[in-house]
Amino acid sequence: MTTIDPHPRGAAPFDTSGTFRDEQGVAHYADLPSSLVEMFRATVRDHPGQEALVEVDGERLTYQQLWDRAARVAGGLRAAGVERGDRVANLLPAGVGWVLGFLGTQLAGAVAVPVNIRFAQPEIDYVLADSGAKTVLRPEAPLPDGEPYAAGDLQIDELAAIFYTSGTTGFPKGAMTTHENFLSNVETVLRVHGIDRAEGPRQRNLISVPLFHVTGCNTQLLVQIALGGTTVVLPAFHVRPFLRTIVDERINVLTSVPAIYALALSQPDFADFDVRAVTRVGYGGSPIAPSLVERIKAAFPQARVGNGFGLTETSSIATYLPHEWATEHTDSVGFAAPVVDLALHEPDSAGVGELLIRGPNVVAGYWNKPEATDRTFAGSWLHSGDLARIDEDGLVHVVDRAKDMINRGGENVYSVEVENALASAPGVADAAVVGVPDDVLGEKVGAVVVAASEDERLSVPAVLDHLAASLADFKIPQYVHVRTEPLQRNPGGKLLKRQLREQTAWGAPVRGR
């Protein structure tokens, strides 16, 4: 097998102390807890009376209450026949019940299977069958309840959860997430943000994205449990409750997708909401316009901002763009995380190749998919499917998904580049770029554009003129479809381009070339 050399870390500013490499060359954090259960146990010991979990318009639990309730769920699962390593599917909505189900599964020594409740029924049925779930936690049934139980001998390399990918093509695949995967991501979040554990109990984090996705679960909920901070869960996103909760719950940590920030900042009375408590704003999941970064900084003047990039297969964060770099490098997803190695597979003359990722955050493979595992996780490297370049500073620039690159008569057009240009065009709130079949060129460039206002007609010529100032002619869309309804995205904020290709009626081209 060909040896792959990691790309130099460049100017990456993150702390890499207390790490080591195994015989395969994979880096690890040296002093992690042995499992999520031990991490949770330590926080309950140190901060039993600290507020742990708040469901907006629902229950509030301290860490001791959270442990006691989760231990009873674990006891109920064990009484129902769930054993170590069995899968427990979680179909509960976001809130206290979901968290108790997830933590109770961990305390039982079982494997959590968070299910995307937005999946169509055939997809849900597939996940339940493929995972071999022994028990399914459903909203219409009470949580399991029994004598308190907490597994005490779990190992760091044991399977802790199976997160099913959002399935932008075909049925989803189950990413096998170990305790080390979870714990490594927690440590990474602390290091890339420069968080002092002593400040943990003062943190109040609002989760506005799904808990069944790694951003909500791994990078927010579990990080706060590690710190002894408070997790506030918004059961469903609506912009007014989102803003009210920031104020009412004194939220100081936000992590969400760009579309949510854009919607919140577009509220005419945003200035009436006192958001001065917010000291950290994270974003990711989709490209972000430079203008939106500036608006976020202006709206949250006390906050450090940053862009996180990762996949279900990396347990969330693989790279991070910190505050000091966030304004001048909005086209970058940042530097490799402290224990993450990056490489480019078969880069072209422009330095663009498939992004390869290696680290203790990379999952153990796909459940029940040995061929897909061998193909995607070859030689300890995750083949991400993202096309990227890495500059001399070590900053990663994701230019497209490999399957979304448009080949226009032999010219490669990276859809993300065009989408970024569209994001700053007048009257454009959101945009997606896809290939449109063409008999002569093979593909032409098509853009689906969401108008910023339903009251004002979007000027397509003005948008094209804007693009001409920054893009080569062959990259400017020949087809533009304007709509007012939001674009379809998966729970991680990524565009569902297959649906857009299938559902968009393009009409006549807006330009001839």
Per-region residue spans from a language model:
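AMP-binding/adenylate-forming catalytic core of the ANL superfamily
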Residues: 119, 254, 359, 364-365, ...
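AMP-binding/adenylate-forming catalytic domain of the ANL superfamily
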Residues: 472-492, 513
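Conserved AMP-binding/adenylate-forming core of the ANL superfamily
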Residues: 28-32, 49-95, 99, 120-125
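Gly/Ser/Thr-rich phosphate-binding loop
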Residues: 226, 251-256, 267-328, 341
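AMP-dependent adenylate-forming
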Residues: 12-21, 39-62, 406
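Conserved AMP-binding/adenylation subdomain of ANL enzymes
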Residues: 183-204, 212-252, 267
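Conserved adenylate-forming
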Residues: 77-82, 149-157, 163-207, 227-229
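Conserved ATP/PPi-binding loop(s) of AMP-dependent carboxylate-activating enzymes
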Residues: 335-339, 347-376, 411-413
